[in-house]
Swiss-Prot record:
Sequence positions that bind Mg(2+) 2: N241, S245, E249
EC number: 4.2.3.-
Protein name, as recorded: Longiborneol synthase CLM1
Pathway terms, separated by semicolons: Mycotoxin biosynthesis
Cell membrane is among the record's keywords: no
Purpose of the protein: Terpene cyclase involved in the biosynthesis of culmorin, a tricyclic sesquiterpene diol reported to have antifungal activity and some phytotoxicity to wheat coleoptile tissue, contributing to Fusarium head blight disease. The terpene cyclase CLM1 is responsible for the cyclization of farnesyl diphosphate into the intermediate longiborneol.
Knockout mutant characteristics: Leads to complete loss of culmorin production. Does not affect the trichothecene biosynthetic pathway since 15-acetyldeoxynivalenol (15ADON) is still produced. Keeps the ability to convert exogenously added longiborneol to culmorin.
Protein encoded by which gene: CLM1
Family: Belongs to the trichodiene synthase family.
Keywords: Lyase, Magnesium, Metal-binding, Virulence
Catalysed transformations (reactions): (2E,6E)-farnesyl diphosphate + H2O = (-)-longiborneol + diphosphate
Organism this protein belongs to: Gibberella zeae (strain ATCC MYA-4620 / CBS 123657 / FGSC 9075 / NRRL 31084 / PH-1)
Amino acids binding Mg(2+) 1: D112
Amino acid sequence: MLATPTLSNFDKPSLPSSEGGDPALAARLQPLYSRFLTDLDLQPEYRRHESEKLMEEVLKFAKSTGVPHDLNSHSYQSLMVGYTYADNCLPYHDIEVKVYVAIYTWLATICDDAEALGIIDDVQLFEQRFILGEEQPTVLLRAFADQLKLTYKLYHPLVANLILCSSLNLLTSTSLVARKGIKEKGDHPSKGGNYFAWYIRERDGVGEAYSWFTFPKRQFPNLDIPIEAIEDMTRFIAYLNDVLSFYKESLAGETHNYINHTAAYEGVDSDAALHKTAQDTIDCARRIESVLAGKGEYEKAWRLHASGYLQMHVQRGRYRLIEVGVGDAPDVHEVIKKI
């Protein structure tokens, strides 16, 4: 029997994961972050976009899904992440594509938090139901299934296939990392399992889907042009997030992440793994630029995506980079009040 839509955990108030900062940690990370942003040197220089028309369309679409997103909720905060991503990373894409990416990001973000929200049992069987044509048991998963099907309207069939595979991997990895045995591998890594950290990160980072989001079929009909850079784009999207999330995750005591797992498998401390991941991000950026050099609108679209993605982290208060001296305070759309 299908579950009756109710006020789910993901629509409950979102509270900060930690109240205070860590001045000592911030001081230690500040030189690395400053150097990282300088060396990354993404061009063209980012210009902020805040489209009221897009906000209107995103809220309209979100309402149509039936997924709760009250203002003072985790769901609404996730929706604003989606809005910001679409508007700032895809600034001159068709509004239909922007709305699609915003809603996808919203729903995927909630699904990615499945363990904390107590919905792992629903999420881990999503793919089975999707492949067998069975209806999903909750309003959230029904909305995400519908969103995945919409991919084929906006992207080349082969690109849509890749986006779908990446999306299903996200849900599988979300369920995998909730398992006790998988969590223990981060604390007690097996010798020789060094690539396990990336194996999980590649899947839960959903970077391939976001790489291809850059190239909808109407504006970018030739998938052959960017495909050589997709692996580096996938890694860039994951690595940059890992580097710029490290401070806020450290404050929250979160150690089950790519940087800490890499450190455990490599036998180094987390600072060393952070430095390496920062350099890997820069190396990915340079290779992508080399592949797309002279490729016209394809090059422009990626450069704007990368620049907007970086600034989304710097500008959104959820990453707390203002405490490290390289970020901004929360904007009005993302402030979640305590109650």
